[in-house]
Design a protein with these regions (language model features):
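N-terminal loops that bind phosphate or other acidic moieties
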Residues: 1-24, 28-274
Length: 274
């Protein structure tokens, strides 16, 4: 469960922290954030009034939410959540179907978890008066985004947008002709608030072309073209396994960069001819 994350937050609160920023993602959990909230004192009860542990298979069993034991310092604390995706809690683009398979979920398990997540979302709507599926990023980290937004009143911020603002990225773009970004593996998820889409959207606003050099391409990678990325160059130059690709990463990325710039040079020659 996400219980350990809640323990870290509790420790921070116990030590006097009142302005807490949490970057979420890569959780390996799909519990709707119940585990983390349990560590902070919230009780999730079944139909018999028994407290649940807050793991994924409890999503369908939770019948009531008791927030009376929530850590007393939460009301005086400001929580900011940095998140690199804007997926909702449920649905085809939600926490379970988007990220569940990479966490080991089989199709049968994913269907069961999704039904549990739908039930959990409905209970939150009933008890807290909040439709979590209307909160961008509520499906991040297996639903941690939803729990932080609802129970901690956290402000959700795009992780990449926050970082780009911190480094004054827009100012760095002044006088720039081309931006090159990258990702280990680019696929349809990359269009949902991840680094390439964040950078591409900023570049598009200023009319600056941007390309991505990536380790590999996955399903619907071309969706990134709607977010300011003009082209994708892969590093792989032949049949090879992941271990070899990682071992030769520096060499492969250098080769991909050279191919990218040769293509740009060819484009400049075409422009000269016109």
């Amino acid at each position: 469960t996400s219980y350990g994350t809640g323990e870290l937050i509790k420790t921070a609160l116990d030590r006097g922290c009142r302005d807490i920023t949490i970057a979420i993602g890569g959780s390996a959990t799909n519990d709707g954030g119940m585990g983390a909230m349990r560590a902070l004192g919230i009780r999730f009860l079944d139909e018999n009034g028994e407290e649940l542990s807050g793991c994924g298979n409890d999503l369908a069993r939770v019948a009531d939410i008791d927030i009376r034991g929530l850590h007393g310092a939460v009301k005086d604390a400001k929580f900011t959540i940095m998140c690199d995706v804007n997926n909702p809690l449920t649905g085809p683009d939600g926490a379970t179907y988007t990220f569940g398979m990479q966490k080991g979920g089989t199709p049968k398990i994913l269907d069961e978890l999704e039904q549990g997540m739908i039930h959990y979302a409905a209970l939150i709507r009933e008890k807290m008066g909040i439709d979590v599926d209307q909160i961008p990023g509520s499906g991040a980290a297996g639903g941690l985004g939803a729990a932080f937004s609802v129970f901690l009143k956290a402000e959700m911020k795009s992780g990449i947008e926050t970082v780009l603002d911190l480094i004054h990225f827009d100012e760095l773009l002044e006088g720039v002709d081309l931006v090159i970004t990258g990702e280990g593996r680019i696929d349809w998820q990359s269009a949902f608030g991840k680094v390439p889409s964040g950078i591409g959207n900023r570049c598009r606003k200023k009319g600056i072309p941007a390309i991505a050099i990536v380790g590999g391409m996955g399903d619907k990678a071309e969706m990134i073209f709607d977010h300011g990325i003009d082209s994708i160059i892969t590093t792989i130059n032949g049949a090879m396994g992941l271990d070899e690709a990682l071992e030769r990463a520096e060499e492969l990325y250098a080769g991909a960069a050279e191919r990218a710039f040769r293509m740009i040079k060819a484009g400049m020659k075409l422009q000269d001819r016109s």
